[in-house]
A protein has these predicted regions:
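Glycine-rich phosphate/adenosyl-contacting loop at the front of the ribokinase-like
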Residues: 1-56, 64-66
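Conserved N-terminal subdomain of the carbohydrate kinase-like
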Residues: 24, 48-130, 339-346
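Conserved phosphate/ATP/ADP-binding segment of small-molecule kinases
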Residues: 146-234
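Conserved phosphate-binding/catalytic region of the ribokinase-like
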Residues: 172, 200-348
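Acidic, metal-coordinating catalytic segment for phosphate/diphosphate chemistry
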Residues: 349-393
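A glycine-rich, hydrophobic loop/mini-helix early in the fold
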Residues: 382-418
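The catalytic Nudix box helix
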Residues: 400, 417-452
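Nudix hydrolase/Nudix homology domain
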Residues: 412, 453-464, 468-531
Length: 531
């Protein structure tokens, strides 16, 4: 069951106009009156999408019967706390000429402390049977601005994930309760943090700083420019769906419903949100020495499917939002709309996050977007895995990968057997096992990768007209188990083909500065000592 909380329900009266004149008279072409509130609208969308939902919140003495009638008509389950006062009314002015929405929102009637405490108890009573909780929207006078933080702390005792859709103090305080996902729009995000953003990179970096505080996902909706979803390892971007916009107000609530639906479908399948093959491996200290301790006996999960789940989250959210945009007023998406738009939703990588290191490999404690690391020349970690064997006549040979022709940099060049960056939170060893599996399909067992040495390099170049300063501290490994090239599974985005090359021949090739090889002579000289 997906719980939604609406502490400030309302009557939304939407006026559709053309060329709205502030301070003047503007004819109204259509009016639409709906009872709603952010959490209630999320429940309405979830009901349309076929997901189980229970609506929780306040019900006012005046207007409360209409609120219940609306939920009954939609066959939405609810458990509401009755309070004195009148259901507030909000005025929405949708201008068809420029697709903008102006809002006049009433703050609502004051709520007593006793009613707040009863409401908290009522909400918490449903936690034991819930799979997900949505806290959304404003709160009326009398409700403390840390109410969402309070509910988040209580949800933690039930291991109940929470989506928080709020702004201002409600969002800032709520972040301290570590929700599973937050969803401010760009204006709310900017106002809440007290910062102006001049690029997508700045938005992503600010969101990643919030992720570092223990929040798995931050979604920043960009209105007509699409949406960003930022997690621990990477950031994703989805452009706004190409639809005829008839209403804006229900899109944000439908977006949240899309996140809920993606979560619900994974929950039904019994899938972990980052479920992948695990390997055990030996930890290395920064000098490269084996550090055999209890930590080295733990399993390190390769979170290869976490990005896949992130993409599902964003695709579902954008498809649900698209379905709402085609409807007037505050109407939310229908299942038929969701199914129609889901195949059209595009999601692309907007960035990866690296731990910033010192030249000696020690962490600075800062996490930055990959593009900013390369812009600022920050030291970061990489792993180089050389696959080696010997021919029947005893000659040593190394496996070379030919980089994909679709790569942005050095397409078609010959490169290390397998290599990759350390994502934020990675250690060298787990990154090495992961990259070897992702790029070549080699599932190494504990101890199969032999650490050899660290190598540092600093290169300044220009890429797409931008100065790039690449400062890497790479851990170099050897993999010497038998390898059947016909059974490798190459990562298409990274590798076109692989082939063996004699070590002596490779050394000769690297004497030629024009050779299309991304391999350093110094590294090969170092590897020779271990072969």
């Amino acid at each position: 069951m997906i719980l939604t909380v609406t502490l400030n329900p309302c009557i939304d009266r939407t006026l559709t106009v053309s060329n709205f004149r502030e301070g003047g008279t503007t004819p109204v072409s259509a009016t639409r009156t709906e009872i709603g509130g952010k959490g209630l609208n999320v429940s309405r969308a979830l009901k349309n999408l076929g997901a189980p939902t229970l609506c929780l919140g306040f019900s006012h003495e005046k207007g409360g019967s209409d609120l219940k009638a609306t939920l009954d008509e939609a066959a939405i389950l609810y458990d509401l706390e009755a309070i004195p006062g009148e259901l507030r009314m909000n005025i929405k002015i949708f201008d068809e000429s420029n697709r903008t929405m102006s809002e006049l929102n009433d703050k609502g009637c004051r709520v007593s402390e006793e009613a707040v405490n009863r409401m908290i108890a009522r909400i918490v009573s449903h936690f034991k049977d819930a799979e997900l909780l949505v806290l959304a929207g404003s709160v009326p006078p009398g409700v403390p601005t840390d109410i969402y933080k309070t509910l988040l702390k209580k949800a933690q005792t039930f291991d109940l994930p929470v989506i928080l859709d709020a702004s201002g103090a409600l969002l800032l305080n709520g972040i301290e309760g570590r929700p599973w996902l937050i969803k401010p729009n760009i204006d709310e995000f900017s106002a809440t943090l007290g910062r102006e953003f001049h690029s997508r990179e700045e938005i992503i970096q600010a969101a990643r700083e919030i992720v570092a505080r223990g929040i798995p996902y931050v979604c920043v909706s960009l209105g007509p420019d699409g949406a960003l979803l930022i997690g621990e390892k990477e950031a994703l971007y989805s452009p706004a769906p190409d639809v005829e916009v008839r209403g804006l107000q229900g899109a944000g609530d439908s977006l949240v419903a899309g996140f809920c639906l993606a979560f619900h479908e994974h929950h039904l399948k019994g899938e972990k949100l980052s479920e992948t093959p695990a390997v055990q491996n030996t930890k290395l200290d920064e000098s490269g020495c084996s550090a055999e301790n209890s930590e080295s006996e733990k399993k390190t999960e390769l979170k290869a499917d976490a990005p896949t789940f992130m993409r599902s989250l964003l695709r579902y959210a954008q498809a649900a939002a698209a379905g709402s945009l085609t409807k007037p007023g505050t109407a939310v998406c229908e299942r038929v709309d969701f199914d129609k738009y889901l195949p059209t939703i595009q999601v692309e990588k907007a960035g990866e996050f690296f731990d910033v290191r010192r030249e000696d490999g020690n962490l600075t404690g800062e996490v930055k977007l990959r593009s900013l690391v390369h812009r600022d020349g920050d030291w970061h970690g990489t792993v180089h895995m050389w696959v080696a064997d010997r021919t029947p006549d005893g000659k040593c040979r190394l496996l070379i990968q030919k980089r994909s022709q679709d790569k942005d940099n050095f397409p078609g060049y010959c490169d290390i057997s397998s290599a990759g960056h350390l994502d934020a939170g990675d250690d060298y060893d787990s990154a090495a096992y992961r990259e070897l599996y992702e790029e070549l399909g080699i599932r190494a067992e504990k101890g199969d990768l032999r650490f050899c040495f660290f190598i540092t390099r600093s290169v300044e170049t220009e890429f797409h007209g931008q100065k790039v300063i690449d400062r890497e501290r790479a851990a170099v490994y050897l993999y010497e188990k038998p390898v059947d090239l016909t059974k490798l599974h190459l990562q298409k985005e990274e590798v076109d083909e692989v082939f063996w090359i004699d070590l002596e021949e490779l050394e000769k090739i690297l004497q030629d500065p024009t050779a299309k090889y991304c391999v350093y002579k110094e590294e090969i000289q170092g590897i020779k000592k271990y072969l």
